[in-house]
Amino acid sequence: MADFPGKVSTQTSSQEPQRSFAISSSVDMGFIKSIPGILLIAEIVVGLLVWTLIASTPHYLIPALGWVLFVSITLWLLSIALLVILLLSLHQRLPSVPWPLVLLVFYSVAALLYLTAFLANAATVPGGYYQGHLGASAFFGIVETLLYTASSYFAYLGWRGEGQNAAGSTVPV
């Protein structure tokens, strides 16, 4: 067996410098001033109106309104995420993603989904106390459909390279 010393001397070493992780992102104010940026902000505002108007009613009594809520809340959250990505120029950190095509597909699918949600909403507006809420949500649903259709058009132009692309001049082609 080995003998262990009665005393042990220890030393305190200096701590390693702490490392921080930072993402340097710049806010693209030009995107906010562009037509696609204005459309995206309008889609977020109108989408919020659609789902809050329906959520303020007893929507669980009409099954079709569940679909409208699903579409409106899902696309509202995805639009907010897209706004953050484009506003902070985070898409430039992912050059392998074909952003013009992604935007074209997103907006086209969103327009189609909102069209189905509008039809379901408009077909189920009952008379009575909540008629105003559901009628207004149907109106804003078709407005949202038109906004997403307009965004699809600008995304198509950006994808084809025939004009300003879907996120101003910031999306790499």
UniProtKB/Swiss-Prot annotation:
Membrane topology according to the record: Multi-pass membrane protein
Parts of the chain that traverse the membrane: 35-55, 68-88, 99-119, 139-159
Extracellular face residues: 56-67, 120-138
GO cellular component: apical plasma membrane; endosome; membrane; myelin sheath; recycling endosome membrane
Tissue occurrence: Expressed in the posterior midgut.
A GO MF term: structural constituent of myelin sheath
Keywords in alphabetical order: Cell membrane, Endocytosis, Endosome, Membrane, Phosphoprotein, Transmembrane, Transmembrane helix
Biological process according to GO: digestive tract morphogenesis; endocytosis; myelination; regulation of endocytosis
Localization per record: Cell membrane; Myelin membrane; Apical cell membrane; Recycling endosome membrane
Domain of life: Eukaryota
Subunit annotation: Forms oligomers.
Family indicated by similarity: Belongs to the MAL family.
The protein's name: Plasmolipin
